[in-house]
């Protein structure tokens, strides 16, 4: 069974039964949109197996498109029927391709044709929508590339150059300096950087990176490093911390980041960029999770996104007064990456199904549309007081562009926005799922101290290896905390006509692992 089946169905279910599933986020299927709007027609097998040259949708994105198409065009129960037929005597009915056979038996169509139909429907939908979009005028800055290349997190630097994070199909995230269409490689980073956070103030670069513990596999950290662009020296700011989305102040004195306590509370944390000392740490309002904090030019205010069970909102924190001000109410709008601009805050947000750069007026809360792109605009930054930088999504990756800012030409938009593509009626209304839910009584569980020694053994499995020359039978024990593991088996060597007994014990509670085999 291909992985797109499981993951696509999972995405579809979370999208249908939540307000913030991945299927409602424009960036989730943007690669598929970029391919179909550019006229590209990759086959099912090309997308299924991927490429080292071209970038294709992963199994999440392709799976969501296929499973949603099957449920909408055939029957919501078709997905379950395909699975049932696949797992029922697969080696007798079709030992080579049980899944493909089940798809054809259930839908009377093969999977390649279903993929082509889904792609055709998606193309027809988006071509109709984007034909009405008149894209705004922008100036290309990043170098043209033959293969798929992304330039993210653009920020102005010295002598008219830009700092950005470059990545591609065969390229690790790399800090580059771009000027006059020519790029200079500065430093390669790990692939976790794009998720954990990256920012530059033009003279320095800061990022958060994944740092696993050398011994405890379930313990890991997100630490901060800072790079001085004038010397190319890297400095560790933290060790064994959990810092995400770090941002440097313009003067380079402070770093603000989202951190987490051991109680899993999200904290707005201000750090001295030279010493790594924490200057301030504060809980946000409404028990939310802090995302993408960003400094004002004078380093007095910090704007950030807050996410909780009511959706996402936007706040400003005053560093000197230690006060919060809500500037955008909670909603399920997928807002992201706020930055200050005069008396406005610029941010990413979906508008009619496409991510664009918006602005909110800090005086009257009126919102404006700054960009109008057919695929998406991301990573807003200010080159100067009259020029906006952002990453423009194209059929060949995210490219850095600039656009002149003229507040007189900004288009006011409603705070309540309807997405004609993603605010759909899911097909699950046919199943009357609410009728199947039963009220579950409250149950109290006894809380007791865990005894490590009385729970040392926990036999949970037995196994038989029916090897022709060396059949064996054994048992496996692992305690609940995973600190003790026992395996024991007996096997018979037919050639030598002898039984072989083996027992193995591993004790993992302390730093050195103790192994015993007999």
Question: What positions do the PLM features span?
Answer:
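A short beta-strand motif characteristic of beta-propeller blades
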Residues: 138-145, 182-188, 233-238, 277-284, ...
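N-terminal periplasmic/intermembrane-space "pro-region" immediately following the signal or transit peptide
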Residues: 337, 344, 351, 364, ...
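A flexible loop/linker signature enriched in serine peptidases of the S9 family
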Residues: 23, 27, 147-148, 166-175, ...
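Beta/coil-rich, acidic/histidine-enriched accessory regions frequently appended to metallopeptidases
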Residues: 54-57, 81-197, 202, 229, ...
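Outer-membrane beta-barrel initiation region
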Residues: 147-149, 153, 349, 406-517
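Short loop/turn segments that connect beta-strands within beta-propeller blades
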Residues: 178-182, 228-232, 272-276, 318-322, ...
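Blade-terminus and WD-like Trp-Asp/Gly-His loop motifs, strongest in beta-propeller folds
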Residues: 154-160, 197-204, 246-254, 293-301, ...
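Acidic/His/Gly-enriched intrinsically disordered linker/tail segments
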Residues: 1-73, 80, 84-126, 136
